[in-house]
Amino acid sequence: MIKLVIFDLDGTLLYTVEDIAAATNHALKLYGYPTHPSSVIATFIGNGINKLFERALPHGEKSEENVLKIRKAFIPYYNEHGRDYTRPFPGIKELLQFLSERNIKIAVASNKYQQATTTLIEHYFPEIEFVAVLGQRDGIATKPDATIVEQILLAANISAEDRDSILYIGDSGVDMQTAINAKVKAIGVTWGCRPRSELAKFSPKWIVDTTKEIEEIVESHK
């Protein structure tokens, strides 16, 4: 029986690429750096925004100082415009409702900075109760480190012995490795930022193309 489902945010629950790209390009342009199409920026997403900026900066400009100044320009812009084009993926709201109706606990584990993670979840899913909504926080290792999953287990009051009752759902290799590190079952989703081939490298228990398939997986574990 499934007791807890943990979701990644960007590329799993929400389509966020356009707003992330706009904020990144705003910050790059501010300092005279070349910008990137959103399709390219999509390939930079997954390891937190500092890594995103490092990937977006030109060769020879990837210093910590430059990353931090891009971050300083990015955050206020993204805080204001982070919901301009962002939207839930098809079937996500229905999936969350499906889980809620079955009293399955729901959580978010994201490498997006905490303020934005909380804001987006509250804005797009106000009717859903989450046991934990965790993003990137200072002093806490980012995914694929398993710390964020361990913190969610504590918040959900689920013991280590119950790991077979947990599903971790994400769209990237980072997510699949997080599930491996946390010793929980992974579901890779193909509607996000990464190709199926990247997910397959980590041999998750399932790779799905639709939210209905996730509902079927949950139902099969009664």
Located regions from the model:
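Asp-based, Mg2+/Mn2+-dependent phosphohydrolase catalytic module
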Residues: M1-K3, S39, S100, Q114, ...
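Active-site neighborhood of HAD-like aspartate-dependent phosphohydrolases
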Residues: M1-T43
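Conserved hydrophobic/aromatic "anchor" residues
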Residues: F7-L9, F74, V149
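A general structural signal for well-ordered alpha-helical segments in protein cores
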Residues: I20-A21, G46-N50, V67, R71, ...
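Alpha-helical substrate-recognition element adjacent to the catalytic core
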Residues: A22, L30-G60, P76, P90
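Short helix-capping segments at alpha-helix termini
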Residues: K29-P34, H59-E65, R102, F125-E129, ...
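Metal-dependent phosphoesterase signature
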Residues: R55-E94, R102
